């Protein structure tokens, strides 16, 4: 259950002194993407922030811990997917290499009808994700432990998602091999990237095609109230990924398809 102190739109905390952090950073940022944030959703984001900071003291979840920066660089940035693709209706979404839950948990908060699966290779991060899911009262979302190379071979997950997203730091060729096998034919793979992705797209052209994908669009935006340029690459799934992909653990990174 979310603590009642989070019912207020303005949240106070003590660090070197009394500091008031206005959640307008969140609501204004999401509004720039055409997203309205309810009081209940604001409450959930604040509880998420508290858990993130609490767990970050004992494990490495994020280097970004300041309230305003988390609201903008993690929460608002995660929600930008709504700027690139339609998220209405009951779609199944997989977040590969989710880490502390970005973008999957913010997307679930904003789009509660989404069925979300969070995938991470570190079990202790999965324990954190399960704590967040429970404390925020989220349903229709699960966190699983495993490597994408292994989980993508399982019938339950392979080719079963309408949307696959990732904010993981990896070149697009490698990331495509990790993610495209999960996408159903007709679905989308949307990686979050910093700055321009033109060169990455060019270098990943063969990999995307081999894996059954097709480049559709590039959605560029500046994170509201910052000078941070972000890009969402929209890649469609036009045919099934050959069974030999993804290759064994580590290969997509060590020897990207080129």
Task: Outline where the language-model segments fall.
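Short loop/edge segments at beta-strand edges and connector loops
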Residues: 39, 65, 145-147, 217-219
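Basic Arg/Gly/Lys-rich low-complexity intrinsically disordered segments
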Residues: 1-17, 243-252, 256-258
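SAM/dcSAM-binding transferase cores
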Residues: 202-258
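Conserved SAM/SAH cofactor-binding pocket of Class I
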Residues: 79-170, 176
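Short alpha-helix immediately C-terminal to the canonical SAM-binding loop
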Residues: 125-127, 197, 201
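Conserved beta-strand signature within the Rossmann-like core of class I S-adenosyl-L-methionine
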Residues: 186-196
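Helix-to-beta-strand junctions that scaffold the AdoMet/dcAdoMet cofactor pocket
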Residues: 111, 183-185
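Class I SAM-dependent transferase core
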Residues: 2-90, 94, 124-127, 131-141
């Amino acid at each position: 259950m979310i603590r009642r102190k989070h019912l207020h739109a303005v949240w106070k905390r003590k660090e070197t002194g009394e500091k008031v952090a206005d959640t307008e950073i969140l609501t204004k940022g999401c509004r720039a993407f055409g997203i309205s944030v309810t009081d209940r959703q604001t409450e959930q984001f604040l509880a998420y922030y508290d858990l993130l900071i609490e767990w970050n003291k004992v494990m490495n979840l994020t280097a970004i811990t300041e309230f305003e920066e988390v609201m903008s660089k993690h929460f608002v940035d995660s929600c930008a997917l709504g700027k690139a693709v339609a998220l209405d209706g009951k779609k199944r979404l997989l977040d590969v290499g989710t880490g502390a839950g970005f973008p999957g948990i913010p997307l679930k908060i904003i789009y509660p009808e989404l069925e979300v699966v969070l995938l991470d290779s570190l079990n202790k991060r999965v324990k954190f994700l399960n704590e967040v899911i429970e404390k925020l009262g989220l349903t229709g979302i699960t966190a699983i432990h495993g490597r994408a190379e292994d989980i993508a071979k399982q019938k339950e997950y392979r080719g079963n998602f309408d949307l696959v997203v990732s904010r993981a730091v990896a070149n697009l060729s490698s990331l495509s091999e990790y993610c495209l096998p999960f996408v159903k034919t007709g679905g989308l793979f949307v990686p979050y990237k910093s700055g321009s992705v033109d060169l990455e797209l060019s270098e990943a052209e063969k990999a995307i095609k081999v894996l059954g994908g097709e480049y559709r669009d590039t959605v560029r935006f500046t994170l509201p109230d910052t000078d941070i340029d972000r890009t969402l690459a929209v890649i469609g799934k036009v045919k099934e990924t050959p069974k030999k992909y993804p290759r064994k653990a580590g290969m997509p990174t060590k020897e990207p398809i080129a």
